Amino acid sequence: MNTGIRKDHLRKGETVSWYNSVIAGSVSGVFARMATAPMDTVKIRYQLQPVQEDKYKGIASTVRTIMKEEGLRALWKGNIPATAMYVVYGAVQFGSYSWFNNVWSAKFPRFSQQGQTLTVGALAGMTSSVVSYPLDLLRTRLIANRTSHRTSVAEECRQMWLNEGVRGFFTGISTAMTTVTLSTAIMFLTYETVNIVCENHEKEFWSRPVSASSGIIAGFVSKTMVFPIDTLRRRMQVMNSKRTVHFTKFPAVYHEYRYKSSTAIIYKILRQEGVSALYRGLTMGLCKSVPTTAISLFVYERTMDLFDHGQRWGRSP
């Protein structure tokens, strides 16, 4: 039962149109990307920087360095595949979540709310990561390029096809699936748990502001918990590229990752660069991920509200 502060379309028992959810998810993806594109570039540059290199030090300094060496537009490198990825990812994530949520509620009516949210969120994350992965990899490759020459999406695709084949578009997908599955499950679980707690204490003075911040809280928790795996994913996405000389002064670092398992790569990073390497870029990651998650969830819910209002208006005499 949803007695809360506002309708929650992600709640167990809520019957949501899969079609409407896909549209709302696409819209949320566009808004989320528009707000955070430059931060994404800075975050990924941090994650890809080996410990031997000390080029990018602080957020402001990194932005100045990128603009000085590559121009202002460099902060939007990879924006075309990234925007497409956010649209596809948002559509599949929320669409599959609604579908799994409806099916799970019908098949397992006694399943707990939090248990269902965690399970359905994981399934939605796994599905969306597989569908959108080639776009995610393209985004990382384009952002990693430090030269002033702007590689086009078509050129990058052609180089990947010639040098790596079809498999090149899915390099590191198992790690990505782990990252996104965990992140999505934690995000939806945190979001729903915060809203449930607020509904159970709706008369308390803090319930409304905390409920309004549920998307921010969900983004913070999910990103912090999976960031080390996300760093591993980024490094694996560029390790087979023939352009690694354009990504760092120490391309041999990435070459050493080739033909190794994700476990072996993490061990190598820990041994050569320390634990801090897995968290490099976390501050910018939170600056980007927290508003991204909050905007995505907010826009999705408000778009679904518009669909609800439209249906009620259509039924009115």
UniProtKB/Swiss-Prot annotation:
It is found in: Mitochondrion inner membrane. InterPro entries: Mit_carrier, Mitochondrial_sb/sol_carrier, Mt_carrier_dom_sf. The keyword Transmembrane helix applies. It is a multi-pass membrane protein. One of its GO terms (biological process) is transmembrane transport. The keyword Hydrolase does not apply. Keywords: Membrane, Mitochondrion, Mitochondrion inner membrane, Repeat, Transmembrane, Transmembrane helix, Transport. SUPFAM superfamilies: Mitochondrial carrier. GO terms for cellular component: mitochondrial inner membrane. The chain crosses the membrane at residues 15-37, 80-100, 118-138, 168-190, 205-227, 281-300. Pfam families: Mito_carr. Solcar repeats lie at residues 16-103, 112-197, 206-306. Belongs to the mitochondrial carrier (TC 2.A.29) family. Mitochondrial transporter that mediates uptake of thiamine pyrophosphate (ThPP) into mitochondria. This is Mitochondrial thiamine pyrophosphate carrier 1. The gene is TPC1.
